[in-house]
């Protein structure tokens, strides 16, 4: 994936190739401590030929980082909180609906805007594939409801979008 910047294009790797400071994250998580790490737009780092950290021209994708971290720390759930209440099927049309649940098969038949929802969907898909746990996309103001499955969209390996619908967003 490439991202346009004034005067040039730079790469946004789908998954960072190297996981730095993994123990710095997993030990506090194991101790049930809230850890805030990762994020988008930061300095992209990889390993040089000698195994040392080296900066590269790239964009750090926050959704991909969240998915990678969730898999790395063996998270039971991945929640991507955003400014929309749920995934919208048929986004941008009068038929737009927020499915409460989607399966990986459902996702493969759907298309999402490249710069907004697509990275979130792909990150959830990767997490569910790697862990067989559920992921969710929903409003920043409703993390507890998203976790409980009463708001937002839950993505699982075998859930069925026709099982439930939330009220229109």
Model-assigned labels for residue ranges:
Residues 1-169:
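C-terminal catalytic "cap/lid" subdomain
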């Amino acid at each position: 994936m490439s991202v346009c910047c004034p005067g040039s294009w730079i790469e946004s790797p789908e998954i960072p190739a190297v996981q730095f400071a993994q123990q710095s994250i997993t030990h506090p998580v194991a101790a049930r401590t809230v850890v805030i790490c990762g994020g988008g737009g930061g300095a992209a780092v990889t390993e040089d030929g000698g195994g040392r950290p080296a900066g590269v021209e790239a964009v750090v994708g926050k959704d991909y980082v969240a998915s990678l971290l969730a898999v790395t720390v063996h998270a039971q759930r991945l929640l991507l909180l955003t400014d929309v209440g749920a995934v919208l099927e048929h986004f941008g049309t009068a038929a737009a609906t927020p499915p409460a649940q989607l399966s990986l098969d459902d996702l493969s038949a759907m298309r999402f805007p490249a710069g907004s929802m697509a990275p979130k969907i792909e990150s959830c898909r990767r997490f569910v594939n790697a862990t067989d746990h559920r992921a969710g996309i929903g409003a920043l103001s409703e993390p507890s409801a998203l976790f409980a499955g009463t708001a937002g969209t839950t993505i699982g390996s075998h859930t069925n979008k026709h099982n439930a619908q939330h009220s229109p967003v």
